[in-house]
């Protein structure tokens, strides 16, 4: 998929006219982004993720335009797999199998990837070997461990990790304790078990934590509500085995075992269809830069404090209003009632299990404390909890139990404490 997104699919070696002038050259998009976004970043880093400066006091670029041009040659000759050796430009989309090398379209000359790789890649090794050497060079680059480690910490724990935190995790990237480099399971374990991720004292500092990105906030709500479908199956993209949309004319439709075949009645809350309401949807990033930039700075006090707030880049005035409105609609639609009683769910409708919550409905303090723990990690202020309890007390005595639960839930979900991960 990334080859498709970054125009590397069917990327062909350069062609020349009779005088030797280039007629076409390899597309450089993927070569640039695989370095900038997916491995080493733009500038050299210290092992703790801080900038490594040159003798002139300026940041040191990790690569240059020549590096991009040379690396683009590595990625030539790859296309969708086909048994036809001449199908480089015509093979149909195939998202289930690896790309295939078509040697006639690969640049088999030498490639000088300096400063990423000190020794040029020799000529006539074939596309697979060229690719292996180039990826190994990026994987072994001293920037990769701190660059990837910091990004993972930002996504999983806090937007502004300390250099010491980044260093500890990067060392686990370099060696998982068994001599293996790049063991992401060990890296994630190091991130989540680090002192800075577990310490209540660290969590209390103003700079610690992160805004929950909307799609994870929503999926966390679904988990917290123990949502499931009666069929055990969930609505997703409806595709055939070759990745094409299902239509009445589709010649090779997938079987029910290969795809979520949903009937007409299913949940309106689909994680691939909520971007207009919450600024995110599963698999719908508008660019390869993700929904937001990892170094986004919000002008004002946070910028003055030197803090980055990546997820706030998609939290503008519009979405600051639409997200709570979406949550209100979500709570009402996902917890439907008929005269105060739960409505039977269709086989593919996500339905929460509120058995525990309904046992607490006559104890507003216990209900609020429960939602505080599940959705705000116990961080709701005493004032916020008191206000939610007051709102529940103010409901008419005739209010159905499920509606009381919905009220407490919505008021909790729309608090700042429920939106921030600490």
What do the PLM-derived regions correspond to, one by one?
Residues 141, 145, 149-178, 189-422:
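Flexible, low-complexity segments enriched for small/polar residues
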């Amino acid at each position: 998929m990334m080859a498709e997104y970054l125009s590397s699919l069917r990327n062909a070696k350069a062609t020349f006219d009779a005088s030797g002038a280039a007629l076409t050259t390899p597309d450089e998009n993927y070569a640039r982004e695989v370095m900038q976004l997916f491995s080493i970043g733009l500038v050299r880093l210290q092992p703790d993720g801080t900038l490594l400066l040159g003798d002139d006091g300026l940041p040191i670029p990790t690569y240059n335009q020549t590096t991009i041009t040379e690396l683009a040659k590595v990625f030539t000759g790859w296309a969708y797999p086909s048994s036809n050796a001449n199908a480089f430009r015509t093979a149909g989309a195939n998202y289930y199998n690896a790309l295939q090398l078509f040697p006639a379209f690969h640049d088999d000359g030498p490639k000088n990837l300096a400063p990423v790789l000190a020794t040029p890649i020799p000529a006539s090794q074939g596309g697979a070997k060229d690719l292996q050497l180039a990826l190994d060079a990026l994987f072994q680059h001293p920037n990769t461990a701190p660059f990837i480690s910091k990004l993972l910490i930002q996504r999983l724990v806090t937007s502004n990790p300390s250099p010491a935190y980044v260093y500890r995790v990067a060392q686990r990237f370099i060696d998982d304790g068994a001599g293996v480099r790049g063991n992401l399971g060990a890296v994630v374990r190091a991130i989540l078990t680090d002192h800075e991720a577990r310490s209540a004292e660290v969590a209390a500092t103003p700079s610690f934590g992160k805004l929950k990105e909307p799609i994870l906030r929503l999926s966390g709500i679904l988990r917290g509500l123990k949502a499931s479908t009666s069929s055990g199956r969930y609505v997703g993209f409806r595709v055939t085995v070759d990745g094409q949309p299902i239509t009445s004319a589709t010649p090779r439709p997938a079987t029910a075992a290969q795809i979520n075949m949903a009937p007409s009645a299913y949940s309106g809350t689909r994680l691939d269809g909520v971007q207009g309401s919450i600024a995110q949807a599963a698999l719908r990033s508008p660019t390869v830069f993700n929904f937001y930039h990892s170094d986004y700075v919000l002008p004002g006090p946070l910028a003055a404090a030197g803090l980055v707030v990546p997820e706030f880049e998609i939290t503008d005035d519009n979405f600051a209003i639409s997200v709570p409105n979406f949550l209100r609609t979500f709570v009402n639609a996902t917890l439907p009632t008929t005269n105060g009683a739960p409505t039977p769910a269709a086989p593919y409708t996500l339905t929460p299990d509120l058995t525990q919550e309904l046992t607490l409905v006559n104890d507003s303090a216990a209900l609020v404390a429960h939602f505080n723990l599940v959705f705000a990690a116990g961080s709701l202020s005493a004032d916020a909890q008191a206000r939610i309890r007051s709102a529940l007390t103010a409901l008419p005595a005739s209010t159905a139990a499920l509606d009381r639960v919905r009220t407490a839930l919505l008021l909790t979900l729309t608090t700042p404490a429920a939106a921030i991960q600490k």
